[in-house]
Design a protein with these regions (language model features):
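Switch/communication elements of ASCE P-loop NTPase nucleotide-binding domains
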Residues: 1-104, 271
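Acidic, divalent-metal-binding catalytic cores of TOPRIM
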Residues: 67-275
Length: 275
């Protein structure tokens, strides 16, 4: 099949309409990327429609070309398109989106609900905490998306909002106690860091509804008793969670975002999901 489309591309025909269902079927990841590239080039002079369950075929460089189909008991089947200006204003921003949204992060488009987190420690910790609460997030269709730092959380929240994807955001507050710092140079550095984090925190508070915004104070390391200077935070997070006896033993900072996203997608803890 790929050879047919490649040949069509090579002979430079224009004005065709292609409709392809599940182009990822029977293709390993490398071939999926290759096929996606061919279809993207074909779309320059033709119309290409694909339906997919593969994150590989989602190209956020042109977000206006992505249509998200969702189905639930309340609304039935709905289709959601976004305006380009809702997400990107410049070519530079479009290229950033293409870079940020890899296959793992593109999972959000297939999720019933999403928890946006800063880094790898949280990405590991929330599913583990869910299991301690007898909540298998995969079974409920919930994805934990690591955004590569606090500075990127707002971008992901804007994309989710534009496409109507239910989400919550979990971020470190990262505000240091200046009164506890005696060294003048260290205090000056901490003041600058506080100002930077305050700016990012304010931007998140201004965009994300309060009921969807959760803060680790001052950060996840403090909440979970992790050494900030270690290079093995995930192991320490695992040991912290492994020692917990059940849902009542999980810190509120971990528990509340999980419960909030479940409420947003209409799931009660006692409900059995449709497998």
């Amino acid at each position: 099949v790929i050879a047919i489309f490649r040949t069509y591309e090579e002979i430079k025909k224009e004005g065709a309409i292609f409709a392809i269902e599940e182009p990822e079927v029977y293709l390993h990841p490398q071939k999926q990327r290759y096929f996606s590239t061919i279809l993207s080039r074909l779309s320059g002079q033709n119309q290409v429609f694909i339906t997919t369950h593969s994150p590989t075929f989602i190209r956020l460089y042109e977000p206006e070309n992505v249509c998200l189909i969702r189905r639930n008991n309340a609304d039935g089947t709905t289709a959601k398109l976004c305006e380009r200006e809702q997400i990107v204003k410049t070519e530079k921003e479009a290229l950033k989106l293409e870079n940020y949204f890899d296959n793992q992060r593109n999972e959000m488009f297939f999720a019933k609900g999403v928890i946006f987190v800063e880094g790898a420690t949280e990405k590991f910790a929330f599913p583990y905490a869910g299991r301690k609460m007898d909540v298998d997030i995969d079974r409920y269709g919930i994805s934990v998306v690591e955004c590569g730092g606090k500075g990127n959380l707002l971008t992901f929240a804007k994309v989710a909002t534009a496409f109507g994807i239910p989400y919550v955001v979990v971020a470190d507050e990262d505000i240091k106690d200046l009164a506890a710092i005696k060294d003048p140079e260290k205090k000056k550095k901490a003041e600058a860091e506080n100002a930077n984090h305050t700016k990012k925190n304010t931007a998140l508070k201004d965009f994300v509804p309060a009921a969807q915004m959760f803060w680790m104070i001052p950060n996840i390391e403090a909440v979970m008793g992790i050494n900030e200077n270690t290079d093995n935070k995930i192991k320490q997070a695992m040991e912290y969670l492994k020692a917990k006896k059940g849902k009542d033993d999980i810190a509120a900072e971990m528990k509340n975002p999980l419960l909030a996203i479940m409420r947003m997608i209409g799931i009660n803890k006692e409900d059995k999901p449709n497998d």
